[in-house]
């Protein structure tokens, strides 16, 4: 495994572990998701460079567009929950209370 592969693999695993174990605030969960998406973007971009084909270079840009949509939807949910519940803590968010 090359150092480049190790770095984006460890970045993805760190984001996944942060999402699984550090579940206090919604903003920290969104940041972990963004870190995972960024490492996937880097991995997909490196894969497209290795294949040296024009058709494979569209997939990283599509992933980046979906990542931006995910970030905007996540921030909209963060603002909505902060306004209704008064906090962004994940423990206070319960679907049965709505």
UniProtKB/Swiss-Prot annotation:
It is found in: Mitochondrion membrane. It is a multi-pass membrane protein. InterPro entries: NADH_UbQ_OxRdtase_chain4L/K, NUOK/Mnh_C1-like. Its EC number is 7.1.1.2. The chain crosses the membrane at residues 1-21, 29-49, 58-78. One of its GO terms (biological process) is ATP synthesis coupled electron transport. GO terms for molecular function: NADH dehydrogenase (ubiquinone) activity. It is an enzyme of class 7 (translocase). It holds the Pfam family Oxidored_q2. Gene3D superfamilies: 1.10.287.3510. Keywords: Electron transport, Membrane, Mitochondrion, NAD, Respiratory chain, Translocase, Transmembrane, Transmembrane helix, Transport, Ubiquinone. It catalyses: a ubiquinone + NADH + 5 H(+)(in) = a ubiquinol + NAD(+) + 4 H(+)(out). GO terms for cellular component: mitochondrial membrane; respiratory chain complex I. Belongs to the complex I subunit 4L family. Core subunit of the mitochondrial membrane respiratory chain NADH dehydrogenase (Complex I) which catalyzes electron transfer from NADH through the respiratory chain, using ubiquinone as an electron acceptor. Part of the enzyme membrane arm which is embedded in the lipid bilayer and involved in proton translocation. This is NADH-ubiquinone oxidoreductase chain 4L. It comes from Salmo salar (Atlantic salmon). The lineage of its organism: Eukaryota, Metazoa, Chordata, Craniata, Vertebrata.
């Amino acid at each position: 495994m090359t150092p480049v592969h190790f770095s984006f693999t460890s970045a993805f695993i760190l984001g996944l572990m942060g999402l699984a174990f550090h579940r206090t605030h919604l903003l920290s969960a969104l940041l972990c998701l963004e870190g995972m998406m960024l490492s996937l973007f880097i991995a997909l971009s490196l894969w497209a460079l290795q294949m040296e084909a024009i058709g494979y270079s569209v997939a990283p840009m599509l992933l980046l567009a979906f990542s931006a949509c995910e970030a905007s939807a996540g921030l909209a949910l963060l603002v909505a929950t902060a306004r209704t519940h008064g906090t962004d803590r994940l423990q206070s968010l319960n679907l049965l209370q709505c």
